[in-house]
Amino acid sequence: MPSFDVVSEVDTHELTNAIDQANRELATRFDFKGVDAKFERDGDVINQFAPTEFQLKQMNDILRARLAARGIDVLSLEFGDIETNLAQARQKITVKQGIEQKIAKKIAAALKDAKLKVESQINGDKLRVQGKKRDDLQDAIAVLKAGKFELPLQFNNFRD
C-alpha cells in the first residue's frame, strides 16, 4: 500500500547558516555600529541579545529575512517574551521540530473531511498517510498544502 509521512522539520545546517549570515549583517549595519548585539544558537533555541527592545525588534526582521533566504519557514519559530534589564534586552526564539499531537489530529481531521480514500495514523512527531492508489496520496498532499496549519509541513518517505 503506498504511503508517505507528513513531518515538520527544520534543517539545522541551514539554520546555523542563516544565524551566521544574520550576525554578519549585524556587524555591517550602520545602526548597529558599536553595539553589542548578537544571535546565539543553542540546540533548538536561538537567543538574541541587544541593548534595547527596539533593536531586538529590528534584529527579528533581519533574522526573518535570512531564514527566508535559506528556505526556512518562519512559521517554525516561536518568539518568546522580551526580557529587559538595565544593561541589555534579550529574547528566546524556539525552533519547533515535529508535529504536536493537537496539530496532528487537525491534519487527520482535514484528510477525513476531504473524503479521500486514505488512512492516517500518528507516529510520535510525524503523521503517516496510506492509500490504495498513488493518485489518492497526491490528492491528500494537495489538500494538506491548501490547508492552513500553524506550522510548515513537508512530505517525505514515499513508499509504493
From Swiss-Prot:
Q: Which GO terms describe its cellular component?
A: cytosol
Molecular function in Gene Ontology: nucleotide binding
Pfam families linked to this entry = DUF520 (PF04461)
Q: Which residues bind 3',3'-c-di-GMP 2?
A: 132, 134-135, 160
* UniProt binding sites for 3',3'-c-di-GMP 1: 33
Instruction: Describe the disruption phenotype.
Output: Disruption of the gene leads to reduced adhesion to monolayers of human bronchial epithelial cells compared to the wild-type. Mutant has reduced persistence in C57BL/6 mice compared to the wild-type strain.
Q: Which UniProt keywords apply?
A: Nucleotide-binding, Virulence
- What does the UniProt record say this protein does? Cyclic di-GMP effector that significantly contributes to virulence. Binds bis-(3',5')-cyclic diguanylate (cyclic di-GMP or c-di-GMP), an important bacterial second messenger that controls a wide range of cellular processes.
What is the similarity comment for this entry? Belongs to the YajQ family.
NCBIfam families with a match to the protein in the record: PRK05412.1
This protein is called Cyclic di-GMP-binding protein Smlt4090
Q: What is the lineage of its organism?
A: Bacteria, Pseudomonadati, Pseudomonadota, Gammaproteobacteria, Lysobacterales
